[in-house]
Amino acid sequence: MNRLFKMVSLLLALCLVLTAVPFAYAEDEVIDADLTCTITLGNWPPDTAADAEKALFEGYKATMAKQYPNVTLVPDYYSYSLSNYVPMAKGHTAPSIFQPPFTDPQLLISQGLVGDVTDALEQFGVLDQFSPSYVEMLADENGRIYGLPRDGYVLGMHINIDLFREAGLMTEDGLPMYPKTLQEMAEYGQIIKEKTGKAGLVFPASETYGGWLFTNIAWNFGCVGENALEYQDEDGRWVCNFTSPECIAAMEFMRDLRWKYDILNADATTTDWAGAHSLLGTGEAAMNFAADDSVDQPTANKGLPVDSFALIPFPAGPEGRYALAGGTCYMFSPDITKDQAVALMAYLKVLGKLPFLDEQIISGMRADYAAKRDRGAPVLPAISAWTDAEYNAAKQAIIDEYCNVDMRLYADFFDSISQGTIALKSEEPIFAQQLYRELTAVVQRMITREGADVVKALRKAEESFQEYLDDEYNDY
């Protein structure tokens, strides 16, 4: 059980402790001509990506060709989901590197579906510098490591300023009059719907997305501590709790968003993460629960100008102000060899994902943020995965150089994190995806049936998820 709570501590901190390798190489210097292998890159941009992004990765590939001339890199874009990855891993067709969310590593590790990179990390001189929490999250029970952090995120809310302006919800300073609370969100969304005809809030309620977002709403209604959605009893058994007064109130609020305030997008039950960003970016919705790591989706990808976009803190509820903190990691095929593991660590170093500082890495950072700016994505302060002061200062200086937004549209979001005015909370500690699936079904029922019984639906989901907990953990 200590493993789960140590995993939580890392996500809340959104950082890990690593020190920089004490030397670096010139970009065109051969580092290891003997290393010979092929690696497939699941983190390669898709064919539909902007030319600048594809050029950036071609540059990384060229650098690897100079430093490791006998390592072959094969672009192999892959959009991860647990359901499609498992058969790939079992069928020996998984890419060498891929990018799952922080919810999945322990499951993948326990099932033997990912590759061990411990020895490669030791070869790069960083193995002993990992924080205990990091090891607990991406390691097995023997301390063998299977992944590296890519980035972290904090859930907030994306705003389409054009719709706020059309609805008359602007301050004298020309800033959106954004909602500070969930109640204000409902009321402002109603005004927007009435005055513009567009959805006040896009809520993706397909697959597991609805339950995922609902948990953050539930926390802000008080589903934490002794009222948590899941907890361990005195015997160490995991118990789910969907029928507390707090959870019932949160789900009633969810129902009201559809039937009382009528602010949701019409096709919520079939809307996914990408669809939600599309609706906001194309002006079909004014608000979307989303994080700082996806600000490029409605802007660069869907055409919303950066001066028509804002990122705000997750609205507070009647019993708290929490925001989900999570992230994405790099993990590796279970079939990788020792040489492939070393090549993959070298590749991540070239990408600037390890805290090395040299001219090549700084040049890569510049190219990364320049590409974001050039394709119309907001260039924002980073929530760093590293605590190395020199590395973070260099990165922030480059961000400042390429910043292309009015930071007043983002300041409250970042200030709420740095000043601690919002409490960061990681995802539910055990079988989160199954929990989301059960709660998504309840959300779907609430927003499609006006007279749906909240307590009955939550009790049914509670019984189903408890049976799952018993089968998969308590009685195992």
Q: How would you label these PLM feature ranges?
A:
Residues 115-130, 174-178, 223-249, 300-303, ...:
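Short, solvent-exposed loop/beta-turn-alpha elements that line the ligand-binding surface or hinge
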Residues 29-31, 101-156, 162-165, 180-188, ...:
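Hinge/lid segment of periplasmic solute-binding proteins
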